[in-house]
From Swiss-Prot:
UniProt keywords, alphabetically: Repressor, Stress response, Transcription, Transcription regulation
Pfam hit, one: HrcA
Region Disordered: start-end pairs: 300-334
Family classification: Belongs to the HrcA family.
Entry GO MF terms: DNA binding
Listed InterPro entries: GAF-like_dom_sf (IPR029016), HrcA (IPR002571), HrcA_C (IPR021153), WH-like_DNA-bd_sf (IPR036388), WH_DNA-bd_sf (IPR036390), WHTH_transcript_rep_HrcA_IDD (IPR023120)
Keyword Repressor assigned: yes
Protein name listed in UniProt: Heat-inducible transcription repressor HrcA
Domain of life: Bacteria
SUPFAM superfamilies reported in the protein's UniProt record: GAF domain-like, Winged helix' DNA-binding domain
Function of the protein: Negative regulator of class I heat shock genes (grpE-dnaK-dnaJ and groELS operons). Prevents heat-shock induction of these operons.
TM segment ranges: none
GO process terms (BP): negative regulation of DNA-templated transcription
Amino acid sequence: MTQSRRMLVLRAVVEDYIRSQEPVGSTSLTRDHDLGVSSATIRNDMAALEDEGYLIQPHTSAGRVPTEKGYRYFVDRLATVVPLSEAQRRGINSFLSGSVSLKDALQRSARLLSEITGQVAVVASPSLAKATLRHVEMVPVAMTTLLAVVITDTGRVAQHGLTIASMPAVDEINRLSNTVNEQCDGLSLSKSAETVRSIAASAGYESVRGVADTLADAFESMALDERANELYMSGTSHLAHSRSLADLAPLFDALEEQVVLMKLMSNLSEETNASGVGVAIGSEMHTPGLLHASVVSSGYGRSGAAGEPAGNDPVGEPETESETESQTNDTEPIAFVGSIGPTHMDYAATMAAVRAVARYLTAFLSEGRTQD
């Protein structure tokens, strides 16, 4: 019973510190929470929690504040992600439903998430490595150069220059393009590269073998290039309101390292809990600039049958945890939505907002409204 009560005290300390950002004392806990014990008992519990590394006392006469370990315990035991209110859901749908393209939807999502959370929002464009080929067009632009225009199932349009020894006839290039589109439709870029090499080696394509091999190299390069993902960021101005001004410079440096940030949040979005949201706190990220920050991330992508968009309410909340898990498992993440803020962020609210925006983008992709 003592350990169970002690953890209730820890939860109360974390909740109060998130709300006030001031050290929490036993008197306020006794007054504001129904813990069923005296202030003296709570003081003893807080001292024990400090010994166990969940709390620290910044000053001798002050109350306690959570440590990274304390926040982790709190986050891991959040029973559910708090659903958004009906008004919040309507607001998200209203703002994001005006998107006219994938890029517009991603930019709007970053701005909206930042406004909801009061933190930095980061939204990545769909990964080329996880996208499938919809169409490729090859256009001669110089004596020995072709421009390959690649369109994926997520609406991404990528361009890649192809340098070749000599330019084949336009009819032969078009015939190769048609064959590639027929055989590679719906394949990943890496699988498309393998298929194009097979086409290059087959009879009848000798005149465009160099073009085909170069196109296969381009597919492989695009599939492996993490920098090909665009990162949409909003809300860095919110950092100016941080009380920990000394932490701002390294945090801004971390936000500039987009490849590192992309890898961190992409990995986190794939290591999610049952609600489909991942949380990393402080040193867990192994990134010096984020030592005093927390990151909340969720993947978005294609929906399977059980995770299809919820009609006119793509951010409608599942009614049960099993529904949430079903929707999470039926969505193949191809990019992420994330929020970066202080370790004393409102985790429950941030997780709800991140999940809602991720679900909207999943619906957006599933409905095919991705043309730029």
